[in-house]
Amino acid sequence: MTNIRKTHPLLKIINSSFVDLPAPSSLSSWWNFGPFLGVCLGVQILTGLFLAMHYTSDTATAFNSVTHICRDVNYGWLLRYLHANGASMFFICLYLHVGRGLYYGSYTYSETWNIGILLLFAVMATAFMGYVLPWGQMSFWGATVITNLLSAIPYIGTDLVQWIWGGFSVDKATLTRFFAFHFLLPFIVTALVMVHLLFLHETGSNNPTGIPSDPDMIPFHPYYTIKDILGFLVMLTALATLVLFSPDLLGDPDNYIPANPLMTPPHIKPEWYFLFAYAILRSIPNKLGGVLALVMSILILAIVPILHMSKQRSMMFRPFSQCLFWLLVAVLFTLTWIGGQPVEHPYIIIGQTASVLYFLIILFLMPMISLVENYLLKW
């Protein structure tokens, strides 16, 4: 008799995706971050759902409703800090996942990669709108500064900003619509994740060597399910440690001050996971130029497959490319640090240098060094 998991219309979809899925035998721990992201998304949707039951999206009561959640709701403080720090964990896993794709050449699966870029934009939009909801000082001014960037778009910019605001400034209408979109977007993200997996399972997974692994496949269960469960435990332990011991470590103290349109905070900055892009934005003196650089800092990922010049897929056997990759990582850390610093000497010039290096490495140095490696290998 055939096993029910192979015949039942619903179970066979799960079976072909998570049980009998043929997977390369050499997948390292870097392949754990995809499943981690799935867990993060689940945690965010669940905690967010319970938070939404107690939150009010009105400028008069939003800040107090968050305080009420933390003080009066059963385990409300836990929900709130799991949600806030869960977002940080989400972005850590997201950036490591993208980094893994860059290092091992996973971007050659163009459909999966492009859906991944869409996912990155959707998650960033969700996180930005979520940061506005507590209606603290940094929420309000962050929303004002970032939405105002759209005014740099020629001709329609000002109208577009006022249309998004629902008025002439960030106010009640803005908060209400941001809450609506913040609630809706994670479900769109979930749908995109399914499409991402659909395309991934069409081609099969890449592996660290970058060499086709068709002759050497193993079933996903039990090998990778056990490996993922161990990873989940490590990740959730790290998240629990952060939430229970220092929940405000990654937050901004200014967000514990209720939003005041008449008083600007000394340093307006987004959450840490946007600081690298914020640093690139600030490093260009022209407003439109800064906005274009900001968008391109993420959108540049879409042209990475076109810039792949190496005869090898992965960087595993390409030491020069590895050096450049880790230089890129160092540049991103530098940009993240600069994004949190005030706009003054020497931070301005460091930020500008790091921004130029970021684009230079991806657009020119990586393809050039790949051609050099091809030549050295006589390929």
From Swiss-Prot:
Gene Ontology biological process terms from the UniProt entry: mitochondrial electron transport, ubiquinol to cytochrome c
CDD domains: cytochrome_b_C, Cytochrome_b_N
Superkingdom of origin organism: Eukaryota
Sequence positions that bind heme b b562: 83, 182
Gene3D superfamilies for this protein: Cytochrome Bc1 Complex, Chain C (1.20.810.10)
Membrane topology according to the record: Multi-pass membrane protein
Any single Gene Ontology cellular-component annotation: mitochondrial inner membrane
Compartments where located: Mitochondrion inner membrane
UniProt cofactor(s): heme b
Cofactor note: Binds 2 heme b groups non-covalently.
Transmembrane segments: 33-53, 77-98, 113-133, 178-198, 226-246, 288-308, 320-340, 347-367
InterPro entries, per the entry: Cyt_b/b6_C, Cyt_b/b6_C_sf, Cyt_b/b6_N, Cytb/b6-like_sf, Cytochrome_b, Cytochrome_b_C_euk/bac, Cytochrome_b_N_euk/bac, Di-haem_cyt_TM
Chain positions recorded as heme b b566 binding sites: 97, 196
Alphabetized UniProt keyword annotations: Electron transport, Heme, Iron, Membrane, Metal-binding, Mitochondrion, Mitochondrion inner membrane, Respiratory chain, Transmembrane, Transmembrane helix, Transport, Ubiquinone
Other notes: Heme 1 (or BL or b562) is low-potential and absorbs at about 562 nm, and heme 2 (or BH or b566) is high-potential and absorbs at about 566 nm.
Subunit structure: The cytochrome bc1 complex contains 11 subunits: 3 respiratory subunits (MT-CYB, CYC1 and UQCRFS1), 2 core proteins (UQCRC1 and UQCRC2) and 6 low-molecular weight proteins (UQCRH/QCR6, UQCRB/QCR7, UQCRQ/QCR8, UQCR10/QCR9, UQCR11/QCR10 and a cleavage product of UQCRFS1). This cytochrome bc1 complex then forms a dimer.
PANTHER family assigned to the protein according to its UniProt record, in alphabetical order: CYTOCHROME B
Protein name: Cytochrome b
Provenance organism: Artibeus fraterculus (Fraternal fruit-eating bat)
